[in-house]
Amino acid sequence: MRVRKILILGGTRDARQLAFRLIHAGHDVTTSFAGVTEHPVQPEGKVRVGGFGGVDGLRQYLKAENIDVLVDATHPFAAIISANAAAASGDVELLRLERPAWIAQPSDNWIHVADIAAAVSALPAKASVMLTIGRKEVAPFIARLDLSGVARMIEPTSVTLPANWSLILERPPFSLESEMAVLRDNNITHLVSKNAGGGETEMKLVAARSLQIPVVMIARPNKPTVTTYSSVEGINTHISKLGSPSG
C-alpha cells in the first residue's frame, strides 16, 4: 500500500470516522477545523485549527505540505469552504464525503425552502418554533416578534434570546424519546431544520412525523461538482486505488 499525505477538512462525525479509518490504513492524515466550534470532538491523528486565508492560503498549504489527497468532509452547508477547496485543489486529488440528504416520507409535512430568509417567511403568525439550525442564524427568527419557541445548538449563540425563547445546549445524537419530549413539552407547532442528513439528528424528523408537526426544511446550498462519496468506505476504496503519490 502506498502511504498518502491526506488533508481532511473536518468538523463532522463523518470526518472523524474517516480520519480513524485512513490512519489505521497507514496514511499520514491531518484534520483541519475552521475553529468555529470552541470545543470540537477531536479526531485521531494530527489536527490543525483555523482558516487558511482563502483559496490562495489553502493552495499554498497543499503545496508546502505535499498533500496528495484533499477530502472535503465539512458540513453539507459549509458552502464557502467547499468552494475554496474546489478552487485551490489544482493537481491534488479532491474528494468530498457528504452524507445523503434526508428525504420526506409520505406522512411527513415538509415545507421546502431555499434558505434562512425563506424559512423565516414560511412560518405562520404566532408559531411556536423549534430551531435546529445551529447558532449563527438564529437572529432572523428572533426578529419576528410574533414567534416563540426553542433554539437548540451545541454552543451558545451571541444573540440574546428574549423571554419567550428557550435555549437548549446539547450535542447529538438524540433519541426519539427525547425529541418527542422536547416537542411536546414546549408545545412546538413547527420544526425548522437544515437538510444536513445523517442519523445523529434524524430522530427530530421522526418525532415531528409522529406528532404531525410541520417541518420547514432548508435545502442544501449548491456546491462545485467534485468526486463525491456518501460513505467512509467509498473514500477509503478510492484512495487505495490511486496511482503513485505526487512529489
Residue ranges and their predicted role:
Residues 6-35:
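N-terminal basic/disordered segments at the start of proteins
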Residues 20, 30-53, 108-109, 160-167:
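N-terminal beta-loop-helix "entrance" segment that forms/cooperates
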Residues 31-39, 97-103, 116, 135-138, ...:
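Short, polar loop motifs at secondary-structure junctions
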Residues 46-65, 169-178:
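Glycine-rich, highly charged phosphate/nucleotide-binding loops
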Residues 59-116:
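Glycine/small-residue-rich loop that forms an oxyanion/phosphate-binding "nest" at active or ligand-binding sites
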Residues 117-149:
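Internal active-site segments that recognize and position negatively charged phosphoryl groups
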Residues 142-173:
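Histidine/lysine/aspartate-rich catalytic loop segments that bind and position anionic ligands
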Residues 186, 195-207, 215-247:
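C-terminal functional extensions of proteins
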